[in-house]
Structure formats: C-alpha cells, structure tokens
C-alpha cells in the first residue's frame, strides 16, 4: 500500500493450515497467498490448553516440514518474515537457499524457557534481523544475550487502520440496555490472561457507592461460562453485560465513561491503542510488557492484579478534572501515531535495508 516501488516488491503470504482463509477478502489482490495444504486444518486442531496447543504445534511442524523447504528453495525470496510459530522456518533455515534472509518477528511477551533460549541461540547466526513490539521486550532479549545487539530492533505493531476507524466511528451504539447508561468497558478474549475476574470483583466492590455505572465486557473465550456464573453469584447480572465478540469496538469505547485493561500480561496491548484513538479515558494494569510504555503519565496505572489499587485508581480518575483528562488524551493520541500502518511500514523498510 505504501511502497513507491509496487511493481518491484512481490509480497507472498504462506498459509500453512488455513490461517489466512478468513482474511482473504481483506488482503490486497496483489498479494499472493500460497497454501501449503488444501485442507484448512486450523478448523480441526485442538486448542485452548497448553497440552492441546503443543499437540497442534507438533502436527503443524511435521505436516509442513518438507513442503516449506521445497517452497522457499523454489521461490528464493530475499526475505522471510517468521511470526508466532517460528521454530519450523528457523530450523529449516539449515536447508534454505542462502539468499533468503530470515527476520524473526517476536510478538507478545515470549516465555524464554530453556528450549527456546537454546534454540534461538543455536540458530542465531541464521537470523538476519529480530523485531520486538515493545522496548521492554527489546531489553529482555538484549539482556539474555541471545543475538547480536545490532540485529535487534523495536518495531511497533500496525494497530491503527485509519480508514477502518473513520468508517466504524460513525456507527451508532443501538443497544437498548445501554441506552442513556453510563458504562465502563473491558475488551479482550475471555481468558486467564485478560483477568476479567478481577474486573468483575472490582465492579462488585464499587457498584453500591457508584450505582450509576454499568460494566460492559466485549469478547469470547473459554472463561465465558465461569465469568457468567461469577456475575450471577455476586448478584450483579443486571448491571454487567457480556456482549460477546464485536466487529466494531470503537462505538463502545466512544460511548463509555472509561476503558479498563485488567490483563496479567500484554505486549503491547492493542486495545489501549484503540481506546487512545477514540479519546477514551484509560485505566490499566501495570503489567508486562506494553501498557506502561503506551500510557506513561497520560492514564491511570494500577498494580498488576491488585483489586484495591484498581478501585483507588478508578476513584482517582473520577476526581480528576476534565481539563487534565483532556490534556492527557491529546498527549496520548500524539504518542500512538507510532502504531499506525504507515509508521510500521517505514520502520520495517529501515530495518530490512
């Protein structure tokens, strides 16, 4: 989209198990998608637990071992950007054409166990560049002394899609139970990482003192039934609303009193950037890695997984004067420009060349 040499840059996406299938209509027609397998195995692979994910991981590794070697040696790309399931292409670099340079894109806070440390260290010479989404992750990788420091860069995720935002922000929030209601919003997968149990406990603790507020949780996940039972047990079901997955979170943010991120960890925390884009007041856990880098002094950070501190920061937010809130929003909105697609593209080009 942003390249001045569109005819010279050929971009190809490798689809190993059907992971790109649902995004086909969103991908530029000039970008080729190469499917390693006809069947979309992603629909059948076990997930939602560590053991199940390891089984899926091994299956994907074995299924695509020779296919990926054949493809890379046939195509001979200048660069191969590897992301999420990184061990297969990194291991196969032993068999790749030496022309192809591997760029390791670290996404999310990596668990640097013994195996991963050994693996990355062993293959470090085969990796051309490494990108990290946050300064904290960058420092973590540097301190482990796995790669040559000159190979490692901070590359912010391309979270902000301006065209999409401008379109979605025009949509009205036509939800009857939220009409004329003041509400706090939480957004994310309903998983242990997002820590929505803390959010529900927080709301129970403040609801008598601040009866004007409702709590809206947006997302789906394996903890949905647990959270629903918790809401009923605490007798707050009339004021807590689990809305499920929503294609447009902006209309919720734009109509909320504040956004709360309760996560145990992030890297960097996409929804914080989306909230800042909508000028929403932000209260976030001071979890690793990312929220503190984004918010700095322009929001309200509470101690990770600390209920009392969350309540304190919420009350501090309520007492903060509107002119101070506005000033914080303006400063934060300027900072998140580094999370646009254009900024990501320019930085990536600098890193590659």
Which ranges hold each PLM region?
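A conserved mid-protein helix/loop that constitutes part of the nucleotide-sugar donor-binding site
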Residues: 1, 182-208, 215-217, 222-228, ...
């Amino acid at each position: 989209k942003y390249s001045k040499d569109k005819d010279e840059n050929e971009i190809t996406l490798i689809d190993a198990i059907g992971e790109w299938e649902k995004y086909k209509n969103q991908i530029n027609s000039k970008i080729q998608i190469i499917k390693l397998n006809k069947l979309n195995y992603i629909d059948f692979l076990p997930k939602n637990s560590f053991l199940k994910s390891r089984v899926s991981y091994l299956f994907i590794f074995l299924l695509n071992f020779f296919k990926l070697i054949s493809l890379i040696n046939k195509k001979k790309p200048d660069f191969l950007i590897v992301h999420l399931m990184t061990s297969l292409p990194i291991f196969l670099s032993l068999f790749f054409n030496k022309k192809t340079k591997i760029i390791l894109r670290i996404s999310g806070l990596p668990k640097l166990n013994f195996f991963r440390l050994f693996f990355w260290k062993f293959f470090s010479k085969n990796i051309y560049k490494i990108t990290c989404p946050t300064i904290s992750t960058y420092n973590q990788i540097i301190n482990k002394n796995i790669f040559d420091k000159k190979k490692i860069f901070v590359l912010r995720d391309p979270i902000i899609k301006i065209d999409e935002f401008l379109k979605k922000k025009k949509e009205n929030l036509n939800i009857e139970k939220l009409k004329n209601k003041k509400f706090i919003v939480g957004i994310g997968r309903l998983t242990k990482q997002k820590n929505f149990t803390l959010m529900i406990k927080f709301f129970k603790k403040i609801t008598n003192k601040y009866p004007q507020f409702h709590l809206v949780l947006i997302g789906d996940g394996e903890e949905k039934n647990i959270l629903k039972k918790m809401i009923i047990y605490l007798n707050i079901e009339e004021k807590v609303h689990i809305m499920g997955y929503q294609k447009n979170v902006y209309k919720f943010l734009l109509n909320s009193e504040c956004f709360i991120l309760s996560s145990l960890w992030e890297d960097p925390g996409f929804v914080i950037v989306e909230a800042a884009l909508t000028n929403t007041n932000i209260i976030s856990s001071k979890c690793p890695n990312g929220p503190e880098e984004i918010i700095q002094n322009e929001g309200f950070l509470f101690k990770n997984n600390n209920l009392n501190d969350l309540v304190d920061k919420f009350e501090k937010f309520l007492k903060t004067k509107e002119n101070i809130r506005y000033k914080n929003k303006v400063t934060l909105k300027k900072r998140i420009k580094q999370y646009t697609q254009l900024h990501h593209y320019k930085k990536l080009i600098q890193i590659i060349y």
